[in-house]
Amino acid sequence: MTDSKTVSVYTDGACPSNPSPTGGIGIYNPSTGIGIGYKVQDEDMTNNRAEMLAVIMALMSEDAESIEIFTDSEYVSKNLTENIQRWRSDGYKGIKNSDLWEILHDLTYGAINVRFVYVTFVRRGSHVGNKVADALASGAANTTDNYVWDYKKDIDSWINKDPTKRHKKASKPKPKAKPAPNNEAKTSFMPF
């Protein structure tokens, strides 16, 4: 965490029978000790979609001026770093999971400052927050509970509540990435 106005959150997604109609997401905020896990269903659910939904939920849930998202998904962090701007300018044509990439773009280039930290495979075991988020996602994916997060409805409701959150361009230029504390993770993306 960089300052008192920044919230750090760990996210993870799981899809035990990849692909399958059911997966789970986990979000953990170490400063509050609060973690949540949600079962998610989608005809196209995969590990990657679950990872993306976990980040979306974290960005929609946290009320902060600045947020750090720790993820062990190279798919999410790499594509947010290297491809999302080009995909958006091309209208997401031919891009798998384009519905979620569009939402992630809108959230990360919106009104709050977002910094993504990629938790590398070697370091995953040393990140307690990553372990908690992983356990929450796996538990939610495997639960027999009937509650399922209706993410499409919630995302639409969130966007409709404040339409300025859609397609708002960053007001400041993107600064250079900063190294994560103690070299425990690799910074992959930091739009402002």
Annotated model-derived regions:
Residues 11-20, 37, 57-136, 163:
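RNase H catalytic domain
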Residues 142-192:
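Acidic two-metal-ion nuclease catalytic site recognized across multiple nuclease folds
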Residues 1-49, 60-62, 135, 139-140, ...:
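RNase H-like nuclease fold core
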Residues 45-50, 94-98:
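Conserved phosphate-coordination/catalytic loops
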Residues 50-51, 129:
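Hydrophobic (often cysteine-bearing) scaffold residues that line and stabilize catalytic clefts
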Residues 111-115, 140-147:
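Short secondary-structure junctions and interdomain/linker hinges
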